[in-house]
């Protein structure tokens, strides 16, 4: 009986070691960004793949690779313990409202994983550009100025405007080139009027809408708090 118990305990120990090895191997496994469990694809078409990144405080991602050109906007402010593949991890401050761009075509694919140190949930919207760069793209081609909107990103592939509206304020009519993606930075209420059609929308953080064509619209903040939008424009 004692020998049988010892044999069972030894078998259990070996199983635990095997499971631990599999978990460690899985921790090192690299997946495309759109297959990482907390990078959720919310829209995919011929132009873009829109990824909603949501990481609760204290949780981490798998190693994942950004292999496509990738504009993004940070929706919340946190500290990430970020580890680029093959390097030591280090803290990186994320500031809500920051609009960035990773040029994978020029710099090569970027592989990393991170832990969200908080405070709170990390939230971001990333936009993978599905089409390769145009051969006739002109570096530094200007994004058309829009009265009442701030240009926060402008390169040969994509631009972005930031729009802020106080309660009761309106902007427009303004023309946004298409295709475009509008991202809400927080809660609020927005009315937009396009060709005499008025639409009321209750906004939430990281909510977005894709417009395949150029649109001319008037925006009105119909809520009690400031509305902030980031409008990405594809070139």
Q: What name fits each language-model region?
A:
Residues 1-12:
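Bacterial N-terminal signal peptides that target proteins for export
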Residues 67-86, 176-196:
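Glycine- and acidic-residue-biased ligand/ion/polar-headgroup-sensing regions
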Residues 61-63, 81-82, 102, 108-117, ...:
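Short beta-strand His + acidic residue motifs that chelate non-heme Fe in jelly-roll/DSBH
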Residues 44, 86-106, 196-214:
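Short acidic-glycine-tyrosine-enriched beta hairpin
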Residues 22-25:
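Boundary at the C-terminal end of the N-terminal hydrophobic targeting segment
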Residues 106-130, 178, 187, 212-235:
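Ligand-binding loop in jelly-roll beta-barrel domains
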Residues 37-62, 66-72, 144-182, 231-232:
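A short glycine-rich, His/Asp/Glu-containing loop-to-beta-strand
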């Amino acid at each position: 009986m004692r020998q049988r118990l010892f044999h069972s305990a030894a078998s259990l120990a070996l199983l635990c070691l095997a499971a631990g090895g599999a978990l460690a191997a899985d921790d090192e496994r690299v997946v495309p960004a759109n297959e990482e469990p907390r990078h959720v694809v919310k829209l995919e078409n011929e132009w873009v793949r829109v990824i909603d990144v949501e990481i609760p405080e204290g949780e981490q991602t798998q190693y994942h690779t950004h292999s496509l050109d990738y504009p993004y906007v940070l929706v919340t402010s946190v500290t990430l313990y970020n580890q680029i593949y093959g390097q030591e991890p280090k803290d990186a401050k994320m500031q809500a409202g920051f609009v960035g761009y990773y040029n994978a075509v020029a710099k090569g694919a970027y592989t990393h994983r991170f832990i969200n140190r908080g405070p709170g949930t990390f939230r971001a919207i990333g936009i993978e550009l599905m089409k390769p760069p145009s051969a006739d793209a002109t570096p530094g081609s200007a994004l058309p100025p829009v009265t009442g909107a701030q240009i926060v990103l402008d390169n040969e592939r994509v631009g972005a405007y930031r729009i802020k509206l106080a309660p009761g304020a309106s902007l427009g009519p303004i023309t946004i080139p298409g295709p475009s993606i509008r991202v809400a930075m927080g809660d609020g209420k927005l009315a937009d009027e396009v060709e005499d059609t008025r639409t009321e929308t209750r906004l939430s953080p990281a909510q977005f809408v894709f417009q395949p064509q150029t649109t001319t619209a008037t925006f009105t903040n119909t809520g009690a708090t400031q509305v902030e939008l980031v409008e990405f424009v594809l070139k």
